[in-house]
Protein backbone atom coordinates (compact mmCIF):
# COMPACT_ATOMS: atom_id res chain seq x y z
CA UNK A 1 0.00 0.00 0.00
CA UNK A 2 1.02 3.63 -0.64
CA UNK A 3 0.73 6.22 2.15
CA UNK A 4 0.11 9.83 1.10
CA UNK A 5 0.65 12.72 3.50
CA UNK A 6 -1.05 16.12 3.37
CA UNK A 7 -0.05 18.25 6.36
CA UNK A 8 -1.95 21.35 5.22
CA UNK A 9 -5.01 20.06 3.32
CA UNK A 10 -7.83 22.22 2.01
CA UNK A 11 -11.10 22.25 0.17
CA UNK A 12 -10.17 23.43 -3.32
CA UNK A 13 -12.82 25.63 -4.91
CA UNK A 14 -12.43 26.23 -8.66
CA UNK A 15 -14.32 29.04 -10.41
CA UNK A 16 -14.34 28.98 -14.23
CA UNK A 17 -14.86 32.44 -15.79
CA UNK A 18 -14.71 33.64 -19.39
CA UNK A 19 -13.44 37.00 -18.14
CA UNK A 20 -12.29 37.97 -14.63
CA UNK A 21 -13.13 41.61 -13.87
CA UNK A 22 -11.60 43.37 -10.88
CA UNK A 23 -13.56 45.71 -8.58
CA UNK A 24 -16.96 44.43 -9.72
CA UNK A 25 -19.23 41.36 -9.47
CA UNK A 26 -18.18 38.17 -11.30
CA UNK A 27 -20.89 35.51 -11.56
CA UNK A 28 -19.90 31.87 -11.80
CA UNK A 29 -21.96 29.25 -13.65
CA UNK A 30 -19.92 26.24 -12.48
CA UNK A 31 -18.21 25.58 -9.14
CA UNK A 32 -16.08 22.55 -8.33
CA UNK A 33 -15.29 21.74 -4.68
CA UNK A 34 -12.81 18.96 -4.06
CA UNK A 35 -10.65 17.74 -1.17
CA UNK A 36 -7.37 19.48 -1.88
CA UNK A 37 -3.89 20.09 -0.79
CA UNK A 38 -1.13 18.56 -2.86
CA UNK A 39 -1.11 15.20 -1.08
CA UNK A 40 -4.84 14.65 -1.60
CA UNK A 41 -4.46 15.39 -5.31
CA UNK A 42 -1.77 12.69 -5.38
CA UNK A 43 -4.12 10.36 -3.51
CA UNK A 44 -6.97 10.75 -5.96
CA UNK A 45 -4.78 10.07 -8.99
CA UNK A 46 -3.21 6.99 -7.38
CA UNK A 47 -6.72 5.70 -6.70
CA UNK A 48 -7.72 6.30 -10.34
CA UNK A 49 -4.60 4.46 -11.54
CA UNK A 50 -5.76 1.52 -9.43
CA UNK A 51 -3.14 1.52 -6.68
CA UNK A 52 -3.93 0.77 -3.02
CA UNK A 53 -3.59 4.10 -1.23
CA UNK A 54 -4.13 5.40 2.30
CA UNK A 55 -4.33 9.16 2.99
CA UNK A 56 -3.13 10.78 6.20
CA UNK A 57 -2.30 14.24 7.51
CA UNK A 58 -4.06 16.77 9.74
CA UNK A 59 -7.77 17.64 9.59
CA UNK A 60 -10.05 19.79 11.73
CA UNK A 61 -13.47 21.43 11.90
CA UNK A 62 -16.39 21.31 9.47
CA UNK A 63 -14.12 21.56 6.44
CA UNK A 64 -12.14 18.58 7.75
CA UNK A 65 -15.40 16.62 8.07
CA UNK A 66 -16.35 17.57 4.48
CA UNK A 67 -13.00 16.25 3.21
CA UNK A 68 -13.45 12.91 5.00
CA UNK A 69 -17.00 12.50 3.65
CA UNK A 70 -15.85 13.28 0.11
CA UNK A 71 -13.05 10.70 0.37
CA UNK A 72 -15.53 8.14 1.71
CA UNK A 73 -17.82 8.75 -1.28
CA UNK A 74 -15.08 7.86 -3.76
CA UNK A 75 -13.83 4.91 -1.71
CA UNK A 76 -10.45 6.33 -0.67
CA UNK A 77 -9.12 5.01 2.64
CA UNK A 78 -7.97 7.65 5.11
CA UNK A 79 -6.61 7.87 8.63
CA UNK A 80 -6.03 11.52 9.58
CA UNK A 81 -4.83 12.95 12.87
CA UNK A 82 -7.38 15.40 14.35
CA UNK A 83 -6.58 19.03 15.20
CA UNK A 84 -8.58 21.69 17.05
CA UNK A 85 -8.29 24.30 14.27
CA UNK A 86 -10.33 24.57 11.07
CA UNK A 87 -8.91 23.14 7.83
CA UNK A 88 -8.57 25.80 5.11
CA UNK A 89 -10.22 26.69 1.79
CA UNK A 90 -8.19 27.44 -1.34
CA UNK A 91 -9.72 29.22 -4.34
CA UNK A 92 -8.59 29.00 -7.97
CA UNK A 93 -10.09 31.41 -10.52
CA UNK A 94 -9.62 30.11 -14.06
CA UNK A 95 -9.99 32.89 -16.62
CA UNK A 96 -8.82 33.59 -20.18
CA UNK A 97 -6.29 30.77 -20.04
CA UNK A 98 -4.87 32.14 -16.79
CA UNK A 99 -5.12 30.99 -13.21
CA UNK A 100 -5.42 33.23 -10.15
CA UNK A 101 -5.15 31.48 -6.78
CA UNK A 102 -6.28 32.71 -3.36
CA UNK A 103 -4.84 30.45 -0.66
CA UNK A 104 -5.80 30.58 3.01
CA UNK A 105 -2.84 29.88 5.28
CA UNK A 106 -4.78 27.37 7.38
CA UNK A 107 -4.80 26.52 11.10
CA UNK A 108 -1.94 26.84 13.59
CA UNK A 109 -0.84 23.43 14.87
CA UNK A 110 0.10 23.01 18.54
CA UNK A 111 3.25 21.22 19.73
CA UNK A 112 1.08 18.45 21.16
CA UNK A 113 -0.81 17.99 17.86
CA UNK A 114 2.53 17.72 16.05
CA UNK A 115 3.80 15.14 18.54
CA UNK A 116 0.60 13.07 18.30
CA UNK A 117 0.80 13.14 14.50
CA UNK A 118 4.39 11.82 14.46
CA UNK A 119 3.35 8.86 16.64
CA UNK A 120 0.35 8.25 14.36
CA UNK A 121 2.56 8.57 11.26
CA UNK A 122 5.05 6.02 12.59
CA UNK A 123 2.26 3.49 13.17
CA UNK A 124 1.14 3.93 9.53
CA UNK A 125 4.66 3.81 8.05
CA UNK A 126 5.07 0.31 9.48
CA UNK A 127 2.06 -0.88 7.43
CA UNK A 128 2.89 0.53 3.96
CA UNK A 129 5.47 0.06 1.18
CA UNK A 130 6.16 3.67 0.15
CA UNK A 131 5.33 7.18 1.39
CA UNK A 132 4.47 10.28 -0.66
CA UNK A 133 4.70 13.61 1.22
CA UNK A 134 3.44 16.75 -0.52
CA UNK A 135 2.86 20.43 0.10
CA UNK A 136 3.52 23.10 2.69
CA UNK A 137 3.77 22.71 6.45
CA UNK A 138 1.00 24.40 8.42
CA UNK A 139 1.75 27.19 10.87
CA UNK A 140 3.01 26.04 14.25
CA UNK A 141 5.08 23.08 13.05
CA UNK A 142 8.88 23.51 13.06
CA UNK A 143 10.59 23.91 9.68
CA UNK A 144 12.41 20.58 10.17
CA UNK A 145 9.16 18.62 10.66
CA UNK A 146 9.51 16.83 7.31
CA UNK A 147 13.05 15.85 8.33
CA UNK A 148 11.62 14.15 11.43
CA UNK A 149 9.09 12.30 9.27
CA UNK A 150 11.77 11.14 6.82
CA UNK A 151 13.90 9.91 9.74
CA UNK A 152 10.96 7.70 10.75
CA UNK A 153 10.68 6.36 7.18
CA UNK A 154 14.42 5.66 7.08
CA UNK A 155 14.18 3.76 10.37
CA UNK A 156 11.76 1.33 8.69
CA UNK A 157 13.64 1.44 5.33
CA UNK A 158 10.65 2.84 3.45
CA UNK A 159 11.19 4.99 0.30
CA UNK A 160 9.87 8.56 0.32
CA UNK A 161 8.74 10.81 -2.54
CA UNK A 162 8.92 14.39 -1.24
CA UNK A 163 7.31 17.34 -3.04
CA UNK A 164 7.85 20.52 -1.05
CA UNK A 165 9.88 23.68 -1.47
CA UNK A 166 11.66 26.49 0.34
CA UNK A 167 13.11 26.17 3.82
CA UNK A 168 11.32 22.88 4.58
CA UNK A 169 13.04 21.22 1.60
CA UNK A 170 16.40 22.80 2.44
CA UNK A 171 16.21 21.44 6.00
CA UNK A 172 15.57 17.94 4.62
CA UNK A 173 18.47 18.14 2.16
CA UNK A 174 20.83 19.34 4.93
CA UNK A 175 19.75 16.48 7.23
CA UNK A 176 21.14 12.95 7.39
CA UNK A 177 17.91 11.13 6.40
CA UNK A 178 17.21 11.71 2.69
CA UNK A 179 14.08 11.28 0.59
CA UNK A 180 14.24 8.88 -2.37
CA UNK A 181 12.80 11.47 -4.79
CA UNK A 182 12.43 15.23 -4.91
CA UNK A 183 10.69 17.17 -7.71
CA UNK A 184 11.78 20.83 -7.85
CA UNK A 185 11.24 23.16 -10.80
CA UNK A 186 14.01 25.42 -12.14
CA UNK A 187 12.88 28.36 -10.00
CA UNK A 188 13.01 26.25 -6.83
CA UNK A 189 16.43 24.89 -7.85
CA UNK A 190 17.69 28.44 -8.33
CA UNK A 191 16.55 29.35 -4.80
CA UNK A 192 18.04 26.21 -3.24
CA UNK A 193 21.42 26.60 -4.93
CA UNK A 194 21.58 30.40 -5.04
CA UNK A 195 22.42 30.26 -8.75
CA UNK A 196 20.47 30.75 -11.95
CA UNK A 197 19.14 27.44 -13.25
CA UNK A 198 17.69 27.35 -16.78
CA UNK A 199 16.33 24.50 -18.91
CA UNK A 200 19.71 24.13 -20.63
CA UNK A 201 20.99 20.54 -20.29
CA UNK A 202 24.52 21.47 -19.20
CA UNK A 203 23.18 23.92 -16.60
CA UNK A 204 20.76 21.31 -15.23
CA UNK A 205 23.49 18.67 -15.04
CA UNK A 206 25.73 21.05 -13.11
CA UNK A 207 22.87 21.97 -10.77
CA UNK A 208 21.90 18.38 -9.98
CA UNK A 209 25.55 17.51 -9.41
CA UNK A 210 25.75 19.83 -6.38
CA UNK A 211 26.63 18.34 -2.97
CA UNK A 212 23.24 19.43 -1.60
CA UNK A 213 21.58 16.53 -3.45
CA UNK A 214 24.00 13.83 -2.24
CA UNK A 215 22.06 10.80 -1.02
CA UNK A 216 18.89 11.68 -2.95
CA UNK A 217 18.36 8.85 -5.44
CA UNK A 218 16.11 10.75 -7.87
CA UNK A 219 15.94 14.48 -8.64
CA UNK A 220 13.22 15.15 -11.22
CA UNK A 221 13.00 18.71 -12.52
CA UNK A 222 9.73 19.88 -14.06
CA UNK A 223 10.22 22.04 -17.17
CA UNK A 224 6.55 22.75 -17.91
CA UNK A 225 5.73 22.42 -21.62
CA UNK A 226 9.38 21.45 -22.27
CA UNK A 227 8.90 18.22 -20.30
CA UNK A 228 11.36 17.30 -17.59
CA UNK A 229 15.00 16.63 -16.75
CA UNK A 230 16.00 13.96 -14.26
CA UNK A 231 18.99 12.52 -12.45
CA UNK A 232 18.79 8.95 -11.11
CA UNK A 233 21.97 8.10 -9.18
CA UNK A 234 24.58 8.70 -11.94
CA UNK A 235 22.26 8.72 -14.98
CA UNK A 236 20.69 11.82 -16.55
CA UNK A 237 17.48 11.85 -18.60
CA UNK A 238 15.74 14.36 -20.87
CA UNK A 239 11.97 13.90 -21.12
CA UNK A 240 10.19 15.36 -24.16
CA UNK A 241 6.41 15.65 -24.12
CA UNK A 242 3.89 16.29 -26.94
CA UNK A 243 1.90 19.51 -27.16
CA UNK A 244 -1.58 19.20 -25.61
CA UNK A 245 -4.59 21.42 -25.03
CA UNK A 246 -4.52 22.52 -21.40
CA UNK A 247 -7.94 22.79 -19.72
CA UNK A 248 -6.93 23.13 -16.05
CA UNK A 249 -3.26 22.89 -14.99
CA UNK A 250 -4.07 22.84 -11.25
CA UNK A 251 -2.79 19.60 -9.74
CA UNK A 252 -0.67 18.50 -12.71
CA UNK A 253 2.49 18.52 -10.61
CA UNK A 254 0.69 16.40 -8.02
CA UNK A 255 -0.41 13.96 -10.72
CA UNK A 256 3.24 13.73 -11.78
CA UNK A 257 4.16 12.87 -8.18
CA UNK A 258 1.46 10.18 -8.22
CA UNK A 259 3.11 8.69 -11.31
CA UNK A 260 6.55 8.72 -9.69
CA UNK A 261 5.19 7.08 -6.54
CA UNK A 262 3.20 4.47 -8.46
CA UNK A 263 6.19 3.54 -10.63
CA UNK A 264 8.45 3.11 -7.59
CA UNK A 265 5.74 1.07 -5.86
CA UNK A 266 5.63 -1.29 -8.86
CA UNK A 267 9.46 -1.30 -9.30
CA UNK A 268 9.21 0.02 -12.87
CA UNK A 269 12.22 0.99 -15.01
CA UNK A 270 13.66 4.53 -15.16
CA UNK A 271 12.05 5.13 -18.55
CA UNK A 272 8.67 3.80 -17.40
CA UNK A 273 8.81 5.94 -14.26
CA UNK A 274 9.51 9.16 -16.19
CA UNK A 275 6.91 8.42 -18.86
CA UNK A 276 4.24 7.44 -16.31
CA UNK A 277 4.91 10.56 -14.23
CA UNK A 278 4.70 12.97 -17.17
CA UNK A 279 1.75 11.16 -18.73
CA UNK A 280 -0.37 11.48 -15.58
CA UNK A 281 0.61 15.14 -15.20
CA UNK A 282 -0.55 15.84 -18.76
CA UNK A 283 -3.77 13.86 -18.39
CA UNK A 284 -4.64 15.97 -15.34
CA UNK A 285 -4.09 19.17 -17.34
CA UNK A 286 -6.64 17.98 -19.90
CA UNK A 287 -9.44 17.76 -17.30
CA UNK A 288 -11.53 20.46 -15.60
CA UNK A 289 -11.34 18.73 -12.24
CA UNK A 290 -8.18 18.98 -10.13
CA UNK A 291 -6.48 15.65 -9.44
CA UNK A 292 -8.44 13.78 -12.08
CA UNK A 293 -7.10 11.71 -14.99
CA UNK A 294 -8.92 9.90 -17.79
CA UNK A 295 -7.11 6.56 -17.90
CA UNK A 296 -8.77 5.72 -21.25
CA UNK A 297 -6.31 8.19 -22.83
CA UNK A 298 -3.28 6.92 -20.90
CA UNK A 299 -1.71 4.40 -23.30
CA UNK A 300 -1.83 6.61 -26.39
CA UNK A 301 -0.27 9.58 -24.58
CA UNK A 302 2.31 7.38 -22.81
CA UNK A 303 3.66 6.23 -26.18
CA UNK A 304 4.14 9.83 -27.36
CA UNK A 305 6.47 10.74 -24.48
CA UNK A 306 10.19 10.36 -25.24
CA UNK A 307 12.88 9.64 -22.65
CA UNK A 308 16.51 10.01 -23.71
CA UNK A 309 19.61 9.40 -21.60
CA UNK A 310 21.94 12.40 -21.93
UniProtKB/Swiss-Prot annotation:
Q: Kindly give the Gene3D superfamilies that the UniProt entry links to this protein.
A: 3.40.1190.20
- Protein's pathway: Carbohydrate metabolism; D-tagatose 6-phosphate degradation; D-glyceraldehyde 3-phosphate and glycerone phosphate from D-tagatose 6-phosphate: step 1/2
SUPFAM superfamilies assigned to the protein according to its UniProt record, in alphabetical order:
Ribokinase-like
| One Gene Ontology MF term | phosphofructokinase activity
User: What InterPro entries has UniProt attached to this entry?
Assistant: Carboh/pur_kinase_PfkB_CS (IPR002173), LacC (IPR005926), PfkB_dom (IPR011611), Ribokinase-like (IPR029056), Tagatose/fructose_Pkinase (IPR017583)
> Got a GO cellular component term for this one?
cytosol
Does the keyword field hold Transferase? yes
Output the superkingdom of the source species. Answer: Bacteria
Entry EC number(s):
2.7.1.144
What's this protein's name?
Answer: Tagatose-6-phosphate kinase
Amino acid sequence: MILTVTMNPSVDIAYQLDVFNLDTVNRVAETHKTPGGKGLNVTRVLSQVGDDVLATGLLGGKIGEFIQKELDQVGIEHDFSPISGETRNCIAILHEGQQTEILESGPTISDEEGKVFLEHFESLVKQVSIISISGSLPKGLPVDFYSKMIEICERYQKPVVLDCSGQALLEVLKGHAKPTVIKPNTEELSQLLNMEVTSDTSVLKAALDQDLFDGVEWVIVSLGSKGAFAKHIDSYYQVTIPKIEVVNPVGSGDSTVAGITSALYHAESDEELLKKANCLGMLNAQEKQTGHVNMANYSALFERIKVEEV
